[in-house]
Amino acid sequence: MKEETFTGMLRDAFGSNRAEVILEALKEEASTAIRLNPLKAETEPEIVKGTFGNVPWCRLGRVLSERPSFTLDPAFHSGVYYVQDSSSMFVGQVFREMLGKPEGVLKVLDLCAAPGGKTTDMASSLREHCGNGFLLVSNEVMSNRCGILADNVARWGDPNVIVTSADPSAFAKLPGFFDIILTDVPCSGEGMFRKDEEAVRQWSGENVELCCARQKRILADVWPALKDGGLLVYSTCTFNTKENDGNVEWASETLGAEIATPDCGFPGVLRTGCGYSLAPGLVPGEGQYCAVLRKIGGNAAGQRGSRTSRPEKSGKPDGAEKLLKSLFTFDPVVSDRNGTMIASPAEIAAEIAVITRTVRTISSGVKCGCLKNGKLVPDEDLILNAFLRENAFEEVETDRQTALSYLHRDGIVLDAGIPRGYVALTWRGVRYGVVNNLGNRCNNLHPMNRRILRSI
């Protein structure tokens, strides 16, 4: 990395005095923060004890005094919280400021979503703001990153979030479909220098130009999918003005948009010409930029969801719909996907059908399990879902070591008084897994791809 080139860009973006503060902060250790899941975190999890403080722009955000081993915390695996940089949570605050009164299903696309921090943040805001009346499409074009995204969405437990894997251009087949689009675009990563040594090594002025061009292509490709009057949130984790304000100005002039960044300033957050910029030394977290564009024409996003046709009924085994309807607190539409029962909220089934017909879908609805001899063999995703009815399965509270043994995919044995059959396991009152209790032993149903690999 050419330090003088980087320093010059930093001064252009923040001014000389702030740039010096940021340069000193980049020599320090990165902070660690988590965001609580309001669907599951009824009380503060144990890991929050001794926190440095709350995140000013996120009531569910907590800055930790040190970085613990999240892998060895059952609450992490059950979706009680998500590990996310506090600066990244600022995008969620901007998103919340944009939400108007919805009429119909509010349709939102997180275009570059992996590993899922902003998706889960928006899901919490949409659930609070819209109830059941929203669809959040969480997309990741890189197939090798889709698995962790789908796992994190499953842990979060909201059935109104679906995961897709498509190039931004694929969404042009859905003209005007989305009310809001978040583009957390790939960037030069200057804001991640404290966490990513590879980003430091790869940084150059030439790479900034390449990133800038790629970001413009992404914006242009997805733009047709945004409805007239819809809102696009543009964000990066970098500092330089070319990838930030420069691209927002380009989009405004080229794509037909107006800059519509809401007023949501906080101490330490720099208001730029088009948006907001955060940097270490000025705030506890890492680097983040965020701005909002409104597509010229039509009504404002969040005011009216576009109409979609009803989906065709999917084939399903006899009795499956009745069985699954009894399991959820929402009204499910049941389908059979290669032998696995999927339950999707009826309120957004039409919108889900449009997406699944158009782009490659990794997961949609709740993966419930399969039927064997008329009985459901539950999938772990069903147990993790926050809208599974209480006591839908026998539940057993376990100690920490039993939870870790399950997550390590070791054999476990439950107390003799526990009924045989499928049992949901809980840690501090939150479900994290499921076993088939055979009496003298249990069949561990934790997916192999999610198991803890390190020694416990």
What are these regions (language model features)?
Residues G131, L226-D228:
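Helix-to-beta-strand junctions that scaffold the AdoMet/dcAdoMet cofactor pocket
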Residues L135-E140:
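Conserved SAM-binding motif I beta-strand of class I
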Residues V141-G176, T183:
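S-adenosyl-L-methionine
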Residues E103-A114:
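Conserved class I S-adenosyl-L-methionine
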Residues M1-A41, P45-E46, E286-Y289, I296-I456:
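Polybasic, low-complexity RNA-engagement segments
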Residues N144, D179-D221, V233, C237-D245, ...:
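Mobile active-site "lid"/loop adjacent to the S-adenosyl-L-methionine
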Residues C58-E97, N443-P447:
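Class I SAM-dependent transferase core
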Residues P115-G131:
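Conserved SAM-binding loop of SAM-dependent methyltransferases across substrates and taxa
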